[in-house]
Amino acid sequence: MKSRPLVGQRLARFIGVLTSLILLTSLASCGGGSGAGGAALAPIVVNSLVDEASPSGDTVTLRSAIASASSGQRITFDPSLDGGTIDLTIVGEAHTVLTGEVMGFDTPNNISFLVGYFDRDYGRSALFATKNLFIDASDLASGITLNWSGVEPARVLAVDGDLTLNNVAITGGNSVFDAAADIGQHPDDDQTSTLARGAGVAVWGVARLSDCTIYDNHALGDSQDTSRDGGAYGGGVYADTVVMENCIVSGNTVAGGGAAGGGVFVVGGRDTGLSVSSIS
């Protein structure tokens, strides 16, 4: 009779150990339970200022790094590039197709209304990523500059996902109304011109900017179209949500039939982060 409690205790300990082993095995099969699919990937190190999609040898350009990076994988820069400028000349995406609002119009009541969210054409982007993107120049004392210097107007960077940008300057971007691709998904979506949004950076997600300078970027809508499609929004930055720390946003503009957010236009809400940023 006295042995039964001891047997029960041993059985309880055995079940506890077995449960722990099963849990550890499950975590191991899921990448260690890190929340990011396992150990963090080593950063991709950009070692050239040249704008080239398929560089030869051991050369790594920013464009090639963005193409090969996994979602959220850190992209850094070789110390020899400190203070350098990457002059972007390649249009990475001629028709940047992303989800956007389609508005209808109630003529009798003279009001517009939201039809829904469908694919829209946001025009040319020099760099385009359909994943979380992490560009980190924080190890460079003078950072890195991304400058659009191509022939046709294009925004500097578009991201369908979250963007983390550290110690990077963005300049020279232009987002303009132009002939749109035929991607209409709804009778009310009669988009004929590309949407002028985020000439510097356009992010369909959270834009986290730290120690960045966004300057001299310009969004130009259709001056003859007073609808939302004809407007221009976010000369410097256009994003669902923006978190900015120690940033300068200056000299960016918007113009068109309707325009807002010459420096920053936030679709969902703004968070200035832990320290003050300057927007002018």
Q: What does each model-found stretch correspond to?
A:
Residues 103, 113-116, 124-129, 155-160, ...:
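Glycine-rich beta-solenoid repeat tracts in large extracellular/virion proteins
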Residues 141-143, 164-174, 206-221, 241-253, ...:
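Right-handed parallel beta-helix
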Residues 15-26:
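Bacterial N-terminal signal peptides
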Residues 149-154, 174-181, 218-226, 253-260:
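Short glycine/acidic-rich loop motifs that flank beta-strands on beta-rich extracellular proteins
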Residues 30-197:
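N-terminal, post-signal-peptide segments of secreted/periplasmic proteins
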Residues 35-39, 210, 234:
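Ser/Thr-rich, Pro/Gly/Ala-heavy low-complexity intrinsically disordered linkers and tails
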Residues 1-11:
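N-terminal secretory signal peptides that target proteins for export/translocation
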